[in-house]
């Protein structure tokens, strides 16, 4: 069907959401606006759905949510499943989309366990496992701006769906007509018949009680914390877990305390960026704190800023990941709770400092593709062998961490607990997290790790991103700013090429659109990959040197050379 016909069809049929028809009327005759909404269908990919809220096949709305959920329902039924758990965050229409998904699943005879109020993503993973559900859905767009929403699907293990299973769902989704293709059941009728059931508060308490068991050291110092949930889902559970372990001195940023999908004081509610901390930093001028803590809207990622004497230093995901790994291994080794053959997991784009730390404690470190599902998958592999107690920590540089086996996704609630415990422990020794990080660098070398994103909006942007990746493959660099490229790992072809000999060896990780350039022989690297959830290409750089200045100079030179390839 051509785009104009699709547009006219939506004008005629998209009447159940009062916001859609006025939007469609407002773009009449505007070819670019119509094209962007209808040039493709919002794809059910490995991260589920994510897109701008609005009218059209390329937008998040009740029709695209129903279509995706009908496909998911057919997948669940084809696998012999019969139950699902659903959670949602504070975003615009998250509650609406969650109920629409529940109606579709119930109409297909699938029992739905629905949180009655907004809830963090990790608590969806926990519910799937505890309630023995076949699948799970969380309605969220994580840290994206307020105009976005999304929909992540989970397997019975509590991990986001694997690539293989996502593709199976997509096959079913593609067979569902946009209008009238999804089965629907009245929400209240489904509640009365028990096809939709609210998840009891006892499960929320069980989650908090369970993650509290992962605390290592008792809190013995008065750690002063400023916390912001960034108008998301973290407010209640994060404060509850900190109270539970004895972190009492917590001041919450009032403007960002309550749920608000408009994110009025943080248009980009992303704990990776300084702007998300602006309100917390301002509050810290009146209420000095040792630690500033920010969780994203669905509370699966957490960022921190640490008092440095002159103000506050924001710490990166790689730095926090390295600190947590070292803290967990060192303290559990000291108190005799570290398992034999401990295992930690990180993504390939995360800091290689983790390898040095893991080696010190005879901890096996497994590298996986980007995406926390691959970390959860490794826990599942251990579980199948009865060895899940070997898992001590998993992290990715994009501020996602977990140290539990009861949740198979990144978890900002348990991580907030562990960060505060760690900060309190070191405060008792007269150290800040910045001091401890400096000690790690003295021991293992300076690791300058950076991540840079380049945005390519719309249909033209998608094509540009494909062309950039194709050009990099067709014209592999022999050197980057004077540093020899010693190996190229193309996860698209699953081949590693030794650039000196031309010898190729297979890569055992799954296929992915990632190019990994090994520079020199000291562990330096540059990695290029398109984002799986946003219209961006990301460049990850690791530069290792004996001083921060030298590492930064190398990193900047490599970044500039790759930026030139994007123009």
What is the predicted function of each stretch?
Residues 85-148, 244-304:
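N-terminal small/polar loop signature for handling phosphorylated ligands or for N-terminal nucleophile
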Residues 123-181, 297, 308, 397:
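Active-site phosphate-binding/coordination module
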Residues 33-38, 42, 149-278, 283-284:
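Gly/Ser/Thr-enriched, mixed-charge loops and adjacent short helices
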Residues 83-89, 224-227, 402, 542:
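Short glycine-rich or small-residue beta-strand-to-loop segments that form or flank ligand, phosphate
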Residues 2-101, 108, 196-222, 233:
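An N-terminal, well-structured beta->alpha segment
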Residues 38-58, 142, 229-237, 241, ...:
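Conserved phosphate/anionic-ligand binding catalytic regions in large, soluble enzymes, centered on
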Residues 289-291, 331-529, 536-538, 547-552, ...:
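Phosphate-binding and adjacent anionic-ligand microenvironments
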């Amino acid at each position: 069907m051509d785009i104009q016909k699709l547009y006219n069809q939506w004008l005629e049929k998209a009447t159940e959401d009062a916001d859609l028809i006025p939007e469609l009327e407002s773009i009449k005759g505007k070819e670019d606006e119509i094209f962007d909404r209808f040039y493709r269908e919002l794809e059910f990919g490995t991260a589920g759905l994510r897109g701008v809220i609005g009218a059209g096949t390329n937008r998040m709305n009740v029709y695209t949510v129903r279509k995706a959920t009908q496909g998911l329902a057919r997948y669940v039924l084809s696998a012999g499943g019969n139950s699902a758990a659903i959670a949602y965050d504070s975003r615009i229409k998250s509650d609406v989309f969650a109920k629409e998904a529940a109606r579709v699943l119930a109409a297909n005879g699938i029992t739905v366990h629905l949180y009655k109020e907004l809830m963090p993503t990790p608590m969806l993973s926990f519910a799937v496992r505890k309630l023995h559900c076949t699948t799970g859905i969380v309605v969220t767009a994580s840290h994206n701006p307020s105009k976005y929403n999304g929909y992540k699907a989970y397997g019975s293990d509590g991990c986001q769906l694997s690539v293989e299973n996502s593709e199976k769902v997509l096959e079913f989704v593609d067979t569902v007509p946009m209008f009238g293709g999804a089965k629907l059941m009245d929400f209240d009728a489904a509640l009365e018949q028990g096809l939709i059931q609210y998840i009891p508060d006892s499960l929320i308490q069980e989650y908090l009680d369970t993650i509290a068991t992962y605390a290592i050291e008792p809190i013995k110092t008065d750690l002063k914390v400023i916390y912001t949930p960034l108008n998301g889902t973290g407010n209640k559970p994060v404060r509850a877990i900190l109270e539970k372990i004895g972190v009492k001195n917590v001041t919450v940023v009032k403007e960002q305390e309550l749920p608000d999908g408009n994110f009025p004081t943080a248009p980009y509610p992303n704990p990776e960026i300084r702007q998300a901390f602006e309100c917390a930093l301002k509050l810290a001028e009146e209420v000095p704190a040792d630690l500033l803590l920010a969780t994203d809207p669905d509370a699966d990622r957490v960022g921190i800023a640490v008092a440095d004497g002159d103000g506050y230093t924001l710490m990166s995901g790689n730095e926090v990941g390295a600190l947590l790994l070292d803290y967990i291994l060192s303290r559990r080794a000291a108190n005799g709770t570290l398992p034999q053959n401990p295992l930690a997991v990180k993504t390939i784009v995360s800091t290689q400092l983790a390898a040095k730390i893991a080696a010190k404690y005879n901890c096996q470190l497994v590298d996986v593709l980007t995406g926390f599902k691959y970390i959860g998958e490794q826990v599942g592999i251990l579980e199948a062998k009865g060895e899940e107690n070997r898992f001590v920590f998993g992290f990715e540089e994009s501020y996602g961490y977990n140290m539990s086996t009861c949740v198979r996704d990144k978890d900002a609630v348990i991580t907030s607990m562990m960060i505060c415990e760690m900060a309190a422990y070191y405060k008792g020794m007269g150290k800040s997290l910045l001091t401890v990080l400096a000690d790690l660098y003295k021991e293992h070398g300076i690791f300058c790790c950076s991540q840079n994103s380049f945005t390519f909006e719309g249909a033209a942007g998608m094509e540009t991103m494909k062309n950039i990746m194709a050009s990099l493959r067709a014209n592999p660099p022999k050197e980057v700013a004077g540093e020899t490229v010693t190996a190229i790992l193309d996860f698209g072809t699953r081949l590693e090429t030794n650039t000196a000999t031309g010898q190729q060896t297979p890569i055992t990780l799954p296929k992915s659109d990632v190019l990994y350039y090994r520079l020199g022989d000291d562990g330096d690297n540059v990695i290029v990959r398109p984002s799986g959830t946003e219209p961006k290409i990301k460049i990850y750089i690791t530069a290792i040197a004996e001083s921060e200045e030298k590492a930064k100079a190398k990193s900047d030179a490599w970044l500039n050379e790759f930026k030139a390839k994007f123009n």
